[in-house]
Amino acid sequence: MQPKIKLHYVTYQTFPSKKANTLQTIGNLKYLSKNNVDSTLIFPLRKHESSSNESTLKKVYNYEVDIKIRGISHKFPFGKTSKFERLFFLMSHFLWSRQISRSIMKKSEEGIIFFTRSEWVFYYLSKYDLKVTYECHQLSKLKKIIIPISIKKPASKIIFLNEELKIDAKIKKVYDSKIQILHNGVDEELFKTKVQKDRKRVIFSGNLSRFNTERNLDFIIQSFADPKLSDFNLSIVGANESEFALLNKNIEQLGLSERISVEKWVDREQSIKRIQKSSIGILINSENNLHSTKYTSPLKYFEYVYAGLSVVAVDFKAHRVLPNSESISFFKNNDKSNFINAILNASSSSFSSVGLNEFTLDYRAKQIIDFIKY
């Protein structure tokens, strides 16, 4: 067996959290560790509930492999107050990234590979000529300045979640060998239990809002009032307290309580069971955010497909560039008739399991290792 790669995953995310991006981070680290990578997660303790306790994170994220955990003190304002949240995030992210990068530069052992979702960590570790790979999930005006500067360093690389991110980052072609396009993936171990499917059950699973913007689930609920969908049931899984109350009120007013159920957030294992029980999975987002329309590579898509669901998705470019997108039934945003036809089309389409291995986090981890180790 080859010597273990030592990887330090440095991120401004905090743990534990119900956010999908933390599931993605832990999932990647889990399968990197399974593929002979000595992994360390380094993150700020920027919330009251933040914890670097390994047992706590293993329980929340349901993993057993060895991932070293380093929670770093966070003395900056973001996470301490709800006021000026966006400003404090930008300022605190910059200051913490500079602080941790300087600390890493002073103490870094030879042979460590760094991996990050933070553009500022990428910038500073690149500046210090350390071997670092940046996984880019979205873009901003600031990132479009920082990323092209950082990639010029010889030991710096970038993974983009889809082709649109790479195009819009406008990095010179001379650096193409240092760039990889790699979508999200699914943790196949969560699908070991077989569940009987309900052929008429449709599901939306996940956070009901993104970047403090609702995902337009009211449109989905109102569409289910149409007689053409009277044979179908809808499950919505992942509501917080206020969303749970509001959606149930709307459902009751429409007389749909027998066909539409809303559940609060459930753990990952229970969420997967509900997906497995369903036959159609919905991908929907607000059109008011560029990340949602163009850049996202949603974890739920890979879970839906791996569980054997047909997928119905709002017709955004981000969904068009997903792997196997030719099998998705698309609908125009806010077009009820189009959505209903997409559900009916998905219900009559057959699922193909060909190529499912390439949807897994194990496959993704192997691709990451091959990319970063040289």
Locate the predicted segments by residue.
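N-terminal strand-loop element at the rim of the active site
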Residues: T11-K19, V37-S92, F122, A239-E243
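Short hydrophobic beta-strand element within catalytic cores of glycosyltransferases
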Residues: G281-L283, E303-Y306, S310-A313
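Acidic donor-binding loop of glycosyltransferase active sites
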Residues: I275-K294
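A charged, aromatic-enriched C-terminal amphipathic alpha-helix characteristic of glycosyltransferases
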Residues: E189-K192, N333-N334, N341-Y374
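Conserved donor-binding/catalytic core segment of Leloir-type glycosyltransferases
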Residues: H8-V10, I159, V186, V195-F224, ...
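Glycosyltransferase donor-sugar binding loop
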Residues: S205, N233-L247
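Nucleotide-activated donor-binding/catalytic signature segment of Leloir-type glycosyltransferases, i.e.
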Residues: G238, L246-I275
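Carbohydrate-associated surface elements
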Residues: E164, G185
